[in-house]
């Protein structure tokens, strides 16, 4: 897993966090903001982007999932810990990592759907 994304398994939840203050993530956020001026990429807008992306591409990963981001961090949670939610969390994180690593795909997604995303 890339250094900017973390999965933390607790007794009562599994969290997935994206450190948006890492240089790579900040640079991607600046480019996304150039593409769509509403996409100033704080934690809330990463949440909006990921929510829309997963609705379109893997809605099953949003079942039993909740996000609670802050300005400087994206955070999502599965509040039940089971083999199924552990698997979902790892798939979720891998999809985020794939988007970050394929920047052009991410930029094109925002070009194509940026007006439909409910930015903060």
Report residues per predicted region:
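Aliphatic-rich, non-membrane protein domains
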Residues: 3, 21, 27-28, 98-109
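Surface-exposed, low-hydrophobicity interaction/linker segments
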Residues: 17-63
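Amphipathic protein-protein interaction modules
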Residues: 46-104
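Generic alpha-helix signal with a bias toward terminal, lower-confidence helices
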Residues: 28-30, 58, 77-79, 108, ...
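Short proline/glycine- and acidic-rich turn/helix-capping motifs at secondary-structure junctions
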Residues: 48-52, 104-120
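General N-terminal targeting signals
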Residues: 33-35, 91-95, 113
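N-terminal, charge-rich interaction modules
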Residues: 1-26
């Amino acid at each position: 897993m890339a250094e900017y994304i973390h999965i933390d398994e607790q007794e009562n939840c599994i969290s997935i966090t994206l450190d948006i203050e890492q240089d790579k993530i900040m640079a991607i956020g600046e480019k996304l903001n150039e593409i769509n001026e509403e996409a100033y990429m704080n934690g809330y807008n990463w949440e909006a982007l990921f929510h829309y992306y997963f609705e379109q591409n893997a809605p099953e990963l949003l079942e039993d999932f909740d996000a609670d981001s802050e300005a400087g961090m994206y955070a999502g949670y599965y509040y039940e810990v089971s083999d199924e939610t552990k698997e979902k969390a790892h798939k979720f994180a891998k999809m985020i990592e794939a988007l970050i690593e394929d920047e052009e795909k991410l930029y094109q997604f925002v070009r194509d759907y940026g007006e439909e995303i409910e930015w903060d």
